[in-house]
């Protein structure tokens, strides 16, 4: 469950290490984002020679949450922290590698590229 001002780790190789959620997209009153939702983020911590710089604003898709995601069979998939993958204006991943597992809920038309790059799909 991600809301405005939430800090997230970055699960790709764009050079960003930490981002801050500045908006949850999908309606004017929408408060929370879960796995598979798109948010606007600001880069708070970045590697010196990375593809992105500190202070830049990007779209991102949430790939892991500590709150977890409930499946249809009643199981709950939780992670140790919150993580996102940075996206460009066409909602394609900026990075060429994904670090850590992602959930099966990302397996939609829009995010198949992220699922195929991920080392593990839970």
Curated annotation (Swiss-Prot):
Belongs to the universal ribosomal protein uL14 family. Keywords: Ribonucleoprotein, Ribosomal protein, RNA-binding, rRNA-binding. GO terms for biological process: translation. Binds to 23S rRNA. Forms part of two intersubunit bridges in the 70S ribosome. It comes from the Bacteria. Pfam families: Ribosomal_L14 (PF00238). GO terms for cellular component: cytosolic large ribosomal subunit. The keyword RNA-binding applies. The keyword rRNA-binding applies. One of its GO terms (molecular function) is large ribosomal subunit rRNA binding. Signal peptide: none annotated. Part of the 50S ribosomal subunit. Forms a cluster with proteins L3 and L19. In the 70S ribosome, L14 and L19 interact and together make contacts with the 16S rRNA in bridges B5 and B8. This is Large ribosomal subunit protein uL14.
């Amino acid at each position: 469950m991600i809301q405005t001002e939430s800090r997230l780790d970055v699960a790709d190789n764009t050079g960003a290490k930490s981002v801050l959620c500045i908006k949850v997209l999908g309606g004017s009153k929408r408060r929370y984002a879960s796995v598979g939702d798109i948010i606007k983020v600001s880069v708070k911590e970045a590697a010196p020679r990375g593809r992105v710089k500190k202070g830049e604003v990007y779209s991102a898709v949430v790939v892991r949450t500590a709150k977890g995601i409930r499946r249809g069979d009643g199981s709950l998939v939780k992670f140790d922290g919150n993580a996102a993958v940075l996206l460009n204006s066409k909602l394609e991943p900026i990075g060429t590698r994904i670090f850590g597992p992602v959930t099966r809920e990302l397996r939609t038309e829009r995010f198949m590229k992220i699922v195929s790059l991920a080392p593990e799909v839970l």
